[in-house]
Curated annotation (Swiss-Prot):
Lumenal compartment segments: 51-52, 108-112, 161-166
Residue ranges within the lipid bilayer that do not cross it: 207-227
Entry membrane topology: Multi-pass membrane protein
Organism classification: Eukaryota, Metazoa, Chordata, Craniata, Vertebrata
Name of the gene encoding the protein in the UniProt record: tmbim6
GO MF terms, alphabetically ordered: enzyme binding
Protein name (Swiss-Prot/TrEMBL): Probable Bax inhibitor 1
Provenance organism: Paralichthys olivaceus
Length: 237
């Protein structure tokens, strides 16, 4: 039998029998909101890079934190849904503006790194998301404690590097942070599924978790690629 004559049912690739229909609908809403967040964040970064109307810094960080707190404090129901989506868009926009210092650093080295980092982040995010969706339910939730310990280690490394100013320690922080955030994609995806199965259908807030995972991976991957490119240029001189 010719292998090329076989009929492949692509629909079966996207059937998750271990996830209820209502949760699958919830996940569609989560990823739709995530897509909107990505678009709005890209707009925020674009406005800065092209027009310089907004400057990324402490104000944008405080603004995004304020928006996130406002979103968390606003109850999820049909009456507040549009309001919460607007707050989510504001949070995503300010987060995009907050990326600008990193973008400026990368553009000064090699602008093409931004596209490479975005594509790389997308591949990483999709692969780890599918792994979490196809895996046995709750199989990655045990990572929660390990990931939180990893964040504590990253914090200690940051504090140490404030005194030592070591490039090697900074690079180790970036690589370890990238690994930890990949783990968060697994854990957060399955945690969202479990919350939805237990009746928590707040897709707006759930999209925030995944959005922060994506943005953090993107930021760290950009810096890693930029530093590697910078080192290669130094070696050529």
């Amino acid at each position: 039998m010719n292998v090329f004559d076989r009929n492949i049912n692509f629909d079966s690739l996207f059937k998750f029998s271990q996830i209820s229909h209502s949760t699958q609908v919830h996940l569609k809403n989560v990823y739709s909101s995530l897509a909107v967040c990505m678009f709005v964040a890209a707009a925020g970064s674009y406005v800065h890079v092209v027009t310089r109307l907004f400057q990324g810094g402490m104000l944008s960080v405080l603004g995004s934190l304020g928006m996130m707190f406002w979103l968390a404090m606003t109850p999820h129901n049909s009456e507040t849904e549009k309001k919460r989506l607007a707050i989510l868009a504001g949070f995503a926009f300010l987060t995009g503006v907050g990326l600008c210092p990193t973008l400026d650093f990368v553009i000064a080295i090699n602008p093409s790194i931004i596209v490479t980092a975005f594509l790389g982040t997308s591949v990483i995010f999709v692969c780890f998301t599918l792994s979490a969706l196809y895996a046995k339910r709750r199989s990655y939730l045990f990572l929660g404690g390990t990931l939180m310990s990893g964040l504590s280690i990253l914090f200690l490394m940051s504090m140490m590097n404030m005194f030592f100013g070591s490039v090697m320690l900074f690079k180790a922080h970036m690589y370890l942070g990238l690994l930890i955030m990949c783990g968060f994609v697994l854990x957060d995806t399955q945690l969202i599924i479990e919350k939805a199965e237990n009746g928590d259908k707040d897709y707006v807030w759930h999209s925030v978790d995944l959005f922060l995972d994506f943005i953090t991976i993107f930021r760290k991957l950009m810096v890693i690629l930029a530093l590697n490119d910078k080192d290669k240029k130094k070696e050529k001189k």
